[in-house]
Amino acid sequence: MSAQRIFLIVFFYIYIHFSHGFTEKDDICWHDPYINNYSKCSFMESQQFLICFNGLKDEWKAKAENVQILILCKWPKVKFNPYDVLRGFTSLRKLTIANSNLTQLSTAFPIEAQFLENLKITDTKLHTFPKDAFSNLRSLRYLDLRNNALEEINVKAFNMLALKHIFLTGNPLRCTEDTAWILDPNEGSASSKVVDKDKLLCATPYDGRPLLPIVEIIATLKEECKQTVCNCELIYVIAAGMFTQKQIIAFASVDCSHRNLTEMPIFLPANTSTLRLTGNKIKDLTPLTTNPYYKSVQDLYMDDNLVESIGRLEGSDWLDRFRLLNLRGNKLIDLPTYALENALLHNSNVAGLYLGNNSWTCDCHFTPSFQDLLIRHSNLVKDINDIRCALTSDNDNSNKQIRDLTRTEICISVDEDSWFYPLDILNIVLASLIFLMFGKLLYDYWFFKKTGKLPSISKNMC
């Protein structure tokens, strides 16, 4: 007997001993006794056990009706056609396909495999199979699909009464609302059959996060979003501890832009961190300070609305913890610079402030402190070049960048300017007369010292 055959028989007994499947330690498909890529099979008649590497030749299908256990290692094709490959395997009870590059089951399993109880397709590149792939397997009780490339699963594929145990770990599953079937608690549901659902992990964009709590958050967000006129999306999540929903911090984005709203929404879904209200007709920002649903809002896009004042935010907790505030294109003419300055100094979260395209007042009362704020926090004010004086016909500063104004331009009005030059001329004339008088005094003193005579004007006075 050849060494290869002895080696293979040893592994047959290992497999029989672990009749419920392989462990990673002793999986026979990772111990190929054949050093080349030729198709080779061996059959243990006493156990009705057939194992094949690199494909299944037709010559072995002649013995198919006697095979109860079939192992296919290193399947050479990217597609696996169950209908064609398994035709004639009428006694098959257990099928394993492992350590292969197959990507697709191209057909459903044939009716001849109706007695198949244990199906294991593991460590392949399988990413898709028909929704009726297992519909003919009325005896199937154990389905192992671990360590494949499955991103989405059609839950209808698991709709068999006999099926009791499903394994799915090691697949890059997408965590979307389409995966909400995994939350179904009802007995007999597909979810109740997934043995390892607590170990399932999400793929992009929530790489490595636990699937169950993420899908639960997404499902809850979808339901709560129905109470608004907005679009809602889970942006990202971070783990705050063990992988349970209560220990995952979620960040959701709610987009209510261009909805013709006249006030901020009364209700927001849980975990709303980004709120977009662009292009509405909102005037009042009070809900940021009074409505508890806004507690988690960090990024607020309020551009192109009708906001005239942010005075309501002065001294509020929200102003001390916001991350982004966009007030471009509103009706602002001024703001409480001291309150905003204080918030920017003490808020370690703030990353962006947008104030451009508003009709800002440019006068000596408001603008100097506002200009100082803009220059001091130019790294946070992202649209500083668009922050300009109101566009008017009677102001020399009309539409000028506030950052670049001089104090003279800010604090001297046109009316004041008309009085400035006459007074200046008068001051110059008076100063000149003083210098002339002082010069005449010095001359007279010098003349007296030289001649001992008083100047003529002094004689006349005497």
Stretches found by the model and what they are:
Residues S2-C462:
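Extracellular leucine-rich repeat
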